[in-house]
């Protein structure tokens, strides 16, 4: 027995006290603890190092891959170890030999291999290596005391969540048996401290990209082992910045060791940025660690370190992580190492290389301004020593400044486009461009430009101070251009200098002038070196008011006496009236002759003066003359016209031909009524029966009309009406149309051969033949004048002179009478015949007797020249012809005519072309300009000298009236009702007649910035198709036209303007705009042609480009030549330059001349320019422009062998200006003032009744209207 006990004790001694380990880790209630059983490694671990490379480990059997979290560099974080007392303390050695049973609750971890054993006889202490955060091992402590095989229990506690995971030791342990028995009982031994046993345990954190969490491994001096397969040494899916407690327990030590795990944040939360402001980047550096917004870790545990070279200074920063370095060297490289620390252990490290920016350049050592002219100066300088990339040169005059950016390799610059006699300061500095542009200090130099010619004075006004004294005031010119300011006034009358004044202020009082005399006042500005161009204003003195009072007293006395005489005569006539009809008739006849007054013939040199005298006082003298002419001479019977069979052949019952001179037709089959037609023979000037005045044919009398044409051998028919006027039938259409070809009128066959439409008339070539006569057919020319308005008379008497030229071109000596008819055959017919006959008298005898000839017309046909306005129109046509003569030229004769016009004979006299230009009326102030000169509208005018006349300005509606009708129907409606001055807005634009009269153009100034919206409203309301822009936006530093378009969509009130397309050519830019109105459904397309070769000069540099531009514009316009005079005030084309006159006038004139040449093969430069001047002030204002029009037309239409050869637009256009500047100044005399137009209302004489209810007498449609007076030069 003793022996067996001895063997048992010996066996127990061999196994050692640690064969049975009863260590179960205990934790606080509520914590979930995981115990991991580890076996000690037999191999010692290497010593701890501070540098490591995070490995990729795989400790699971399934080959899953994990990546260490800290890429790029390594550091070891020492674990925070908190001891915890062991819950079980064995009291005796024998307790270790007890067999324990425990159920292990293990997480899924990979077990360490268990095949390693300790060397015999060497006691070993179990260690658990811990790596934090990236796997850097820490040295394990080894014990020299022998130790039996044991197990360690590891418990982990999630501090933040309270979960307790426990892995207990296995309850049953195997041990080695020995046959040796011993009765010796092992004495109990004291256990070592677990802090010492697990002192070298480290924690290694590994970031898992797939789960976005950390895995923690426990490591020590020796690789830990697990005795059983369900033992764990790795914790997975730890969120960043979370905390856990790990409890290490082992039966060989007491108490258990607790490790607090503090999981670090991921490096993706940190971003190193350069926060240096650009402006400070040359001497400062700013680096900042940015933390993501959703950062949940304790910011107090984060710290930062920076170390920058070349200074090699280290900067420890607080939680803000921003580094500022100041006073650094410019353009120098710096390298900074930036570190992020977590619990004072390096978590992330980055190197950042930063270069400071360029420094500010130095001031230029020398700047000089020299060689100044009146518009330029030369600036030179020396290069600075510091680094620079270029120069900026600024030159200024108060308050404006303009700068130029110059290259680095220049050292001089010529400043251009300066104002004369102006102080300028030039500032020059160098600059360098890095992260920002840095400008060096400026170096200045001052200079003054030289003097130049001044501009015209502004705001010149003349007014009467008394009957024979005039006040003249003005303002200084915009451009003085010199050191002094003197005003010189010249007073002229009839081209002769009367007085001269010279003073420092522009306030003159010119007295002691002649009464009722026209004067011209010319004001020059002198700046001390140069004399400017004159500003000219006409002004007339008044009559002598004192003498007028005496005259009025005398007139009252004479009038009173005359009134008494008239009353007596009336009484006497009534007393002598007889009841006998024959005696009454005899008395009337005597009275008709007696009521005529004595009017002397007018000589050509007194024609204008006589006209002025008679038109004065609302045409009182003209009215007296006209009313003295009997409407009907009753001594001439009209029995044939009143016969019953003839009454239906008369259009009006009271407009009948006299029996003695009516046109008699051949009798048909004994029918006496077949000889009648309402037509009369009319004598011309010393040529009997030159004309036949007829009524407009009715449907019932068309056959008789052609019978008259055939029998009278007439070859020219002049029709001075339209078939319908004002919805009233005026004349039957008695000729075949081109589609019809031929029409038969009883025995006369009429064939139309040609039809040509011109603006004011239509020419048709007809052939007539008689069925029953063997005589050959005849050619008949039918000319229909279409420009006579429904009411009144033509505004321009030149139109009737032009009609006369066309008629005379087709008439010859062998022709029969010229047949002239309107509707009734008296009013317009008599007017045309009167003009034709009196012009023959003027050409033959140099005098005219208009009154006497009209009396003779009335003796041949009643009511000839039916109303007073027609009577005055005859005088106006004579004045027009006498003043201006024939200025129309055929294209085939243009070259020879132009050569003669340019000849000087003698050389000192003006050429005929210059004399023709001098005869052009200026039309200054011939119409009112009240609207444009109102105070609220003055700011809308670019020039006070170019203000539209009231009668033809373009009014703007305040709101577009939307009609329920379609837009096509609204186009046909007239706009005149809505164009009243009271309800319309103002814009500086005028209607200008185009060659095709009803189709008007608009001449406008370049829009101001504040009138761009009005400009587009005008385009929309007037249905403009094409805009012609003849100016640049800027002239020097002065705006001459606001840019009224932009990229994309522009909105102006209810208008939207969209630039759709842009095309550029060598001569112009074509833009297409789409206009939309909020109250209109359909958009409109408007084309803009911007001329780029006319740079503001008076004449275009490339005339052929202007012709090409016009040809291209015409392709965009609707087809011209509409019949009728319906006046819509719509314009297909709008032309504008700076002021709407200088370049616009030349363009409009050339546009109309080209149309005239293409349509009629004639040009009339004089009349075209005269018409434009009547429409807008300042149109074609120089002789150079006037001569240019002749030259360009001659170049476009050269002649070869007497035939016109039309030139291509690409052909070279040459001009020969034979007038030098000095001679022109001497030869161009300013025309005198135009006369005022007569009043528009006068009363017609008598009344007529229509023959049928559907027709009215002619004079009701031709009611008196004011004549359009032609002003004189």
From Swiss-Prot:
Modification Phosphoserine occurs at: 944, 963, 966, 970, 973-974, 978, 1209, 1266
Free-text description of this protein's post-translational modifications in UniProt: Heavily N- and O-glycosylated.
Residue intervals passing through the bilayer: 547-567
Database matches in Gene3D superfamilies: Immunoglobulins, Protein tyrosine phosphatase superfamily
Positions with biased composition (Acidic residues): 968-981
Positions with a binding annotation for substrate: 790, 822-828, 866
Membrane topology according to the record: Single-pass type I membrane protein
Quaternary data: Interacts with SKAP1. Interacts with DPP4; the interaction is enhanced in an interleukin-12-dependent manner in activated lymphocytes. Binds GANAB and PRKCSH. Interacts with CD53; this interaction stabilizes PTPRC on the membrane and is required for optimal phosphatase activity. Interacts with CLEC10A.
Protein name, as recorded: Receptor-type tyrosine-protein phosphatase C
